[in-house]
Amino acid sequence: MQRVTLTLDDDLLAALDALSARRGYHNRSEAVRDILRDALNQDPPSPESRRGYAVLSYVYEHEKRELASRLVATQHHHHDLSVATLHVHISHDDCLEIAVLKGDMAEVQHFADDVIAQRGVRHGHLQCLADD
């Protein structure tokens, strides 16, 4: 492991300490390592790490003009990426879907973009984890 020195503004250090306390980190280094891992996982994958896992979450209006059918068609079109999907009715009008995906990260990103771009889909978020 390498030792690195960081210079932080007082406000940023206070926010890091508050985050560390909330999450139960034993020291700042653990918190910074996790923050960096999260940031690196959000960065587009490099050519060396083209495969991995991802979680796609989104909310959609299930009665929006054929939206549910379009989403199912998109999922079936990319069936090779799907590991599992969780569907939750969060209100009379809205559903939350969480899809666990595995495969080529460019294809995963394309699938997520197709889903999130659908009219009626809100709060779309893709969390990627490239294979090490």
UniProtKB/Swiss-Prot annotation:
Entry superkingdom: Bacteria
GO molecular function: DNA-binding transcription factor activity; nickel cation binding; sequence-specific DNA binding
Key words, A-Z: DNA-binding, Metal-binding, Nickel, Repressor, Transcription, Transcription regulation
Cofactor: Ni(2+)
Amino-acid positions noted as binding Ni(2+) in the UniProt annotation, renumbered to this chain: H76, H87, H89, C95
Alphabetical GO biological process terms: response to nickel cation
Pfam families named among the record's database cross-references: NikR_C, RHH_1
CDD domains from the UniProt entry: RHH_NikR_HicB-like
Entry note: cofactor: Binds 1 nickel ion per subunit.
UniProt cross-references to InterPro entries, sorted A to Z: Acetolactate_synth/TF_NikR_C, ACT-like_dom_sf, Arc_rbn_hlx_hlx, CopG, CopG/NikR_regulator, Ni_resp_reg_NikR, Nickel_NikR_proteobac, Ribbon_hlx_hlx
Family the entry assigns: Belongs to the transcriptional regulatory CopG/NikR family.
Functional note: Transcriptional repressor of the nikABCDE operon. Is active in the presence of excessive concentrations of intracellular nickel.
Subunit details: Homotetramer.
Protein name per UniProt: Nickel-responsive regulator
